[in-house]
Amino acid sequence: MCDEEVAALVVDNGSGMCKAGFAGDDAPRAVFPSIVGRPRHQGVMVGMGQKDSYVGDEAQSKRGILTLKYPIEHGIVTNWDDMEKIWHHTFYNELRVAPEEHPVLLTEAPLNPKANREKMTQIMFETFNTPAMYVAIQAVLSLYASGRTTGIVMDTGDGVTHTVPIYEGYALPHAILRLDLAGRDLTDYLMKILTERGYSFTTTAEREIVRDIKEKLCYVALDFEQEMATAASSSSLEKSYELPDGQVITIGNERFRCPEALFQPAFLGMESPGIHETTYNSIMKCDIDIRKDLYAFSVLSGGTSMYPGIADRMQKEITSLAPSSMKIKIIAPPERKYSVWIGGSILASLSTFQQMWISKQEYDESGPSIVHRKCF
């Protein structure tokens, strides 16, 4: 384990995308969809060197003849056979490494069930024979990536959004809140409101097009009502987008109506507070003495936090909820799409972290429950 040559592997498994690479790097080497596809009909692919399953981009490109499954739902692994396939693909096809030669740092969702952490640990040691491993909470890694150990993280990806208050490097479980509203829901919502404009997007292939429109053209309005008025009175907010078939569509108020659902979940028919209120509620569940530190360092992380305008809007909304004397700072690092992975890369390469790994020997002595004693 003291061998300097062997880089640790860092794997951040999200509901939508898997990010993987080597500790010490400043960005993940591999980023691919967290999907496993199986042929719908036996014998359709005879002579194509048919495999019984496909992972990631290959599954995505062959989706016409496959049944696609996401083994991670709302941040939590629900299908271990498929998850194992994703890890296998990560090590052998994407990173091209032998997992038995590298320590592996995995990430987990906040409030991940205990049994899940044990299962991850077991698969790493028993299936992949890793020499050492560690499981870290995603939001905590995002905070490390921003160079702090105390703050609140609003981590929003494809499948789930969490607000996680962290004090001196430890997530405070009683104050963590989960919102089942994230990127996938916003893509669905954009499909719906584009349909109202007369464009038809229904198939899974078309859904990918809408996701691209969302990522390229959507933004968060600072004042929603005012933006709606501007959009109604002029065409200044309209943008055009060329579909793969050459047809050009025009999109106006949909650009900011789509991500507005993060602040007004009622748009999606959900009776829950928006991301600003959820963040505030998380802070209010914490001890009164640390709230000031949380308000002063509120970090946005994950792919769904990438909309232009989101940080200014969060600043405005939280300022109106918080006590008037409170200093509020929203941090939105440019690389926040990958900040969980980056935090993992930083953590796994710290010299002080090297004694934190769970070794194969410790696992053999204690079994999977060792993870609760060493990773918290």
From Swiss-Prot:
Belongs to the actin family. GO terms for cellular component: cytoplasm; cytoskeleton. It comes from Saccoglossus kowalevskii (Acorn worm). One of its GO terms (molecular function) is hydrolase activity. It catalyses: ATP + H2O = ADP + phosphate + H(+). Its EC number is 3.6.4.-. Keywords: Acetylation, ATP-binding, Cytoplasm, Cytoskeleton, Hydrolase, Nucleotide-binding. This is Actin-2. Residues 1-2 form a propeptide. Pfam families: Actin. The modification N-acetylaspartate is found at D3. It is an enzyme of class 3 (hydrolase). Actins are highly conserved proteins that are involved in various types of cell motility and are ubiquitously expressed in all eukaryotic cells. It comes from the Eukaryota. It is found in: Cytoplasm, Cytoskeleton. The keyword Cytoplasm applies. InterPro entries: Actin, Actin/actin-like_CS, Actin_CS, ATPase_NBD.
